[in-house]
Amino acid sequence: MAAITASMVAELRAKTDAPMMECKKALTEAEGNMEKAEEILRVKLGNKAGKAAARITAEGVIASFIDGTIGALVELNCETDFVSRNDDFLGFANEIAKLIATQNPADVAALSALSIGDETVEAVRTRLIGKIGENMTIRRFQRFEGTKLASYLHGTRIGVMVAFDGDEVAAKDVAMHAAAMKPVALSSDEVPAELIAKERSIAEQKAAESGKPAEIVAKMVEGSVQKYLKEVSLLNQPFVKNDKQTVEQMLKAANTTVKGFTLFVVGEGIEKKQDDFAAEVAAQVAAAKQQA
């Protein structure tokens, strides 16, 4: 068998981006044959991706890309906050944000079939799972086209993209405001019906407990719903930089119109696994007693 040299390991790592020890093991198994070692690594990295697929990915990053009047916002998830700061992971997020903007995929499946260099997005994802050792998923994205765009990233965990006409500084202020105040819709009439129904139900329960006449209760409920709509609609919210005016008033003064926006928060709505270490230890002790 040919001796496995450091230069061979380095060459295989450059070709596959796999960890050094994995490269050395593959070369040893392939008896120094570089092509065979590459095949071995592809299988191993693919197996790692398969094993990781069931693990929850509630951490990650938001990446954005704007080029003129096209842009995209994407959420790429991983398992831990540590990996969300990995350079390869961050680079992948930025690459797919650019792809979404320039190639206009219909959904995540279509995005996964697009190419980054000589690899598909899915192949890069699988390779990175094998290299980093954590599951990662492209959760969602939003693409914009045909309008002025502004974006704001709060670190890498909150991202906003705003479509607008008018002043770019005002639009960027709106993006920052949205990241801080997290509106659910541009205006009151765009708030999703299911959210309004939920808020109305809560208001009805609270009002019913007051013991007041039905007509008063009805007014209390309607007042609560209207207050909620103002609180969660972007244009009606007090502007974060000057709460004496609403966002709508600020935009009017800046002769700017916001056409729409998208707000992504990493892991929003994903149920994270909670490790109960006390229960885990108790289970291990019980199992040990049964074996004794």
From Swiss-Prot:
Lineage top rank: taxon: Bacteria
Cytoplasm keyword on record: yes
Residue ranges of coiled coil: none
Gene Ontology MF: a single term: translation elongation factor activity
Subcellular location per the Swiss-Prot or TrEMBL entry: Cytoplasm
Main location: cytoplasm
UniProt cross-references to InterPro entries, sorted A to Z: EF-Ts_dimer_sf, Transl_elong_EFTs/EF1B, Transl_elong_EFTs/EF1B_dimer, Transl_elong_Ts_CS, UBA-like_sf
SUPFAM superfamilies in UniProt: Elongation factor Ts (EF-Ts), dimerisation domain (SSF54713), UBA-like (SSF46934)
Region annotation (Involved in Mg(2+) ion dislocation from EF-Tu) ranges: 80-83
GO cellular component: cytoplasm
Heme as UniProt keyword: no
Keywords tagged on the record: Cytoplasm, Elongation factor, Protein biosynthesis
Job of this protein: Associates with the EF-Tu.GDP complex and induces the exchange of GDP to GTP. It remains bound to the aminoacyl-tRNA.EF-Tu.GTP complex up to the GTP hydrolysis stage on the ribosome.
Annotated family: Belongs to the EF-Ts family.
Entry-linked PANTHER family: ELONGATION FACTOR TS, ELONGATION FACTOR TS, MITOCHONDRIAL
Record protein name field: Elongation factor Ts
